[in-house]
Amino acid sequence: LVTGMGALTPIGNDVATSWENAVNGVSGAGPITHFDASLFKTQFACEVKGFNGADHFDRKKLRQLDLYAQYAVVAARQAVADAGLKDDEKLNRNRVGVIVAAGIGGLHTFEEEAGYYAMNQANGPKYNPFFIPKMIADIASGHISMEFEYHGPNYGVVSACASSNNAIIDAFNLIRLGKADVMVTGGAEAAVYPAGVGG
């Protein structure tokens, strides 16, 4: 039973808008805006539009979140609110889990850190302390769990284009097997960056 949904998509930043645009045949494709793609053969992509992380997170939190994780947390907020779980005092948070999938994870974070390292090798290895926590593909699940204080099963799923489907199947099975009462599940990706487009 699906009780709540959230969405940040190339055709809308919530479920209602995404659905309306989908049934009306609106395309999410457009020129790439996340970086200068003028030297790439492909110069269009389906980006999430009109999203500004600063509208959803304070500065400290933004330092900890790759864009893909920002998308995941914002969509999870929508889903939790839609399900009526946000202020449910009867909810046993030890029996609420989170499984969020990503085909890649923090690609932009990886690009930034690898580039910074390459340019500063003479000064010795230096990385942002948030490099690994921002990049790993299961961190979105962790941030959602921390925000809502959910203490049930928590992990990420990585299986290329099937990642989100597998996350939903895993979440269903955890409920079916009695390991959780409620699961927040889905997927997020933010791979429209040079390595994602050119790789």
Label each residue range with its predicted role.
Residues 1-61:
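ACP-dependent fatty acid/polyketide chain-elongation machinery
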Residues 5, 101-103:
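Structured loops at beta-to-helix junctions and adjacent beta-edge loops in soluble globular domains
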Residues 7, 65, 157:
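Generic anion/oxyanion-binding catalytic loop in active/binding sites
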Residues 13, 17, 23-32, 62, ...:
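Acyl-thioester C-C bond-transforming condensing/cleaving domain
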Residues 34-85, 137-151:
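A glycine- and small-residue-enriched flexible loop/hinge segment at structural boundaries
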